[in-house]
Amino acid sequence: MAFAKISQVAHYAPAQVVTDDDLSKIMDTSDEWIRSRTGIQERRISLNENTSDLATNVAYQLLEKSGLSPEELDFVLVATISPDNSMPSVAARVQGTIGAVNAFAFDITAACSGFVFALATAEKLIKSGAYKKGLVIGAEVLSKTLDWSDRATAVLFGDGAGGVLLEESEEEHFFGESLNTDGSKGGLESGASAVISPYSDGTEQPNPYMQMDGKAIFDFAVKTVSKSIKALVEEKGEPDYFLLHQANIRILDTMAKKIDVSRDKFLANMMSYGNTSAASIPILLSENVANETLKLGSDQTILLSGFGGGLTWGSLIVKI
């Protein structure tokens, strides 16, 4: 039977750093206001790179680190809520740019749970025995979706991308999974489009910007998501580290208490990147491999958990 493993990781973020103090010059906010409520101190903002550019950078890094040629890839999956355009998909753009001529490619839209959903999907593709190698990338340019006069959202989000190379393995590396959706609730919405045709009445004026009910998302995370993670941990055992979606430092603090796990096991980097939605978990994973907190091939276990708009939430326990 075929299994899947994470064999390489990579991340990329735009060079432009925007601090809380920078934001205080263009809107009614302050470093103290942002940091005390979110833990965020700065974020990266793209000047001219689009989502596919960030994702392609990560793809090239993964190929270089692995020594693979793009022709050896079987698939490219990209999790994003900020694509370059509705079609072609970001994944198709990446596939075409890197020359992965033998790979199929598609995007997954599950907001801040997107990378977890994409990784779970990719693991099943390899486990089927039909595919051996593929890229799973989370990439966002959320800055283009924001109303920069709305401090409730504009201070939270940033741009970036991260990803993994998933390959066939003789040993099991994915030990626990919980994927969930509650479409009766929203919490986070972005990029609404009007219904326009010669037959529509033309009265609809949807908001094109990112909108979020912060309190609802916070309550959802610390209640529903923490309960889901706790159940998975009780069933599969406590992992070495928890890599949760990087939305808010207070969410991590509260969830550690709810799950009854040492806060030291919860890795964090939203201080430097803000909320990068589907990119946050792979960026966090790649950074912690780079600083050697995590080591590929060490048999460390990690819990990856995303949660956000949809509502969606999902967790995986993975041996790296």
Swiss-Prot record:
GO terms for biological process: fatty acid biosynthetic process. One of its GO terms (cellular component) is cytoplasm. The active site is at residues 112, 245, 275. It comes from the Bacteria. It is found in: Cytoplasm. InterPro entries: ACP_syn_III_C, ACP_syn_III_N, FabH, Thiolase-like. Residues 246-250 are annotated as: ACP-binding. Its EC number is 2.3.1.180. GO terms for molecular function: 3-oxoacyl-[acyl-carrier-protein] synthase activity; beta-ketoacyl-acyl-carrier-protein synthase III activity. Homodimer. Belongs to the thiolase-like superfamily. FabH family. This is Beta-ketoacyl-[acyl-carrier-protein] synthase III. The gene is fabH.
